[in-house]
Amino acid sequence: MERIAEPELMQDWDQARAYALADFSEPHEAFVHHFQRLFPAFAGGRVIDLGCGAADVTIRFARAYPDATLVGVDGAEPMLRLGREAVARAGLESRVVLHRLRLPADALPGEHDAVISNSLLHHLAEPAALWDAVARAGCPGAPVLVMDLLRPTSKDEALALVGRHAAGAPPLLARDFFNSLLAAYRPEEVRQQLDTAGFGHLGVDVVSDRHWLVWGHV
């Protein structure tokens, strides 16, 4: 199935609110656990979350690493507003800061000891923007973990995934999940992107029926 792009930014308040209120605890906790498994020596430092959205992964990462400070960047103001509210509720304002920044960006906030990103790539009109940001945002040798959706082989398979993982979800959220699956990349496409970006040394692993991981060091 060919990729079908979706809008790059989540600017609609109802859409952003539905996303922020949804229960993504399983994949988001899995993201943090994958980082802990792949980078056992990492203990803390400056971390950047590219495409932080409503900051759920950012907050979970901060809780898992008390000695880390995090900068989350995203281009959608509705998501950032909801994310800042979530950071405040979590009592993490001293360690988590969110900025509005749309990739590709001329300036990223400093060099970081780790680079993370969850479910950003499938939103980007030009995927090279993410890999360029990873290269510029991370210190030499910094751990990198990127996770995103895996495009199914057909629309029927995409509908089956929606039924499996979004049963009972609001229709708006189920529709967004379906569209995101259609906009996602296949592992072989990600591998080609990495090779083109000079990141051929990074690994690409399929970790669920709907997710792949890119991991390694800058």
Model-assigned labels for residue ranges:
Residues 1-17:
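N-terminal, positively charged/glycine-rich alpha-helical extensions of SAM-dependent methyltransferases
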Residues 13-27:
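Class I SAM-dependent methyltransferase Rossmann-like catalytic core
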Residues 25-44:
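Conserved alpha-helix/loop element of class I SAM-dependent methyltransferases that forms part
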Residues 48, 56-104:
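Class I SAM-dependent methyltransferase SAM/SAH-binding core
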Residues 105-109:
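Short conserved loop adjoining the S-adenosyl-L-methionine
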Residues 116:
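A conserved beta-strand element that flanks and buttresses the S-adenosyl-L-methionine
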Residues 124-134:
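A short, conserved alpha-helix within the catalytic core of class I
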Residues 147-197, 203-205:
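C-terminal alpha-helical "lid/dimerization" subdomain adjacent to the S-adenosyl-L-methionine
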